[in-house]
Amino acid sequence: MSWKPLILCVDDTPSVLEGLKMLLEENGYRVLTATNGKEAVQAFTSHSVDLVLLDFHMPEMNGDMAAARMKDSKPDVPIALLSSDECLPSRDLEVVDCFIPKSKPIVSLLEKVDYLVSLRFLFRPFGALNAQAAAERVSAHQAGPESERPNGISMKKDGIQKTL
């Protein structure tokens, strides 16, 4: 039996959550689900998660706030923020590693998931450095920069921003 990465999927729309779960399981991932930000933070802290796919617009706690709490406890775990919005203010994206509009094709989502999971294991030996970079992202998020990010899939790793 081979080991499979565990992905935490968070969305308040049951059909979206079930679709993500089926897609990821069909592609070799184990999946844990939550329907709001508070549930997500609890699941994140009590499980050894390898990646988080987090909806932005949710009741009780938006995705950016849930991501900030997650990064406080485990800064080396990559978090991808998903949204039906094509673009979000940069202050909402500072703490996450990747932004994926839900309108992007499924193959784009799977490519980003594969990439983020591989980065997680590639950079795992450098956890202290990643923790420092994540702490800087959390601080920047709390400061609230004013600029907007362009449309597309934005990825950030150790302070380097790429928009695909």
Question: Each PLM stretch: what is its role?
Answer:
Residues 58:
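Receiver (REC) domain active-site loop signature in two-component systems and cognate sites
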Residues 104-117, 121-130:
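C-terminal output helix
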Residues 120-164:
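CheY-like receiver
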Residues 14-32:
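Two-component/phosphorelay signaling modules centered on CheY-like receiver
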Residues 55:
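Active-site residues of response regulator receiver
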Residues 45-47, 69-76, 94:
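Conserved phosphotransfer cores of two-component systems
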Residues 35-39, 62-66:
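Acidic catalytic/metal-coordinating carboxylates
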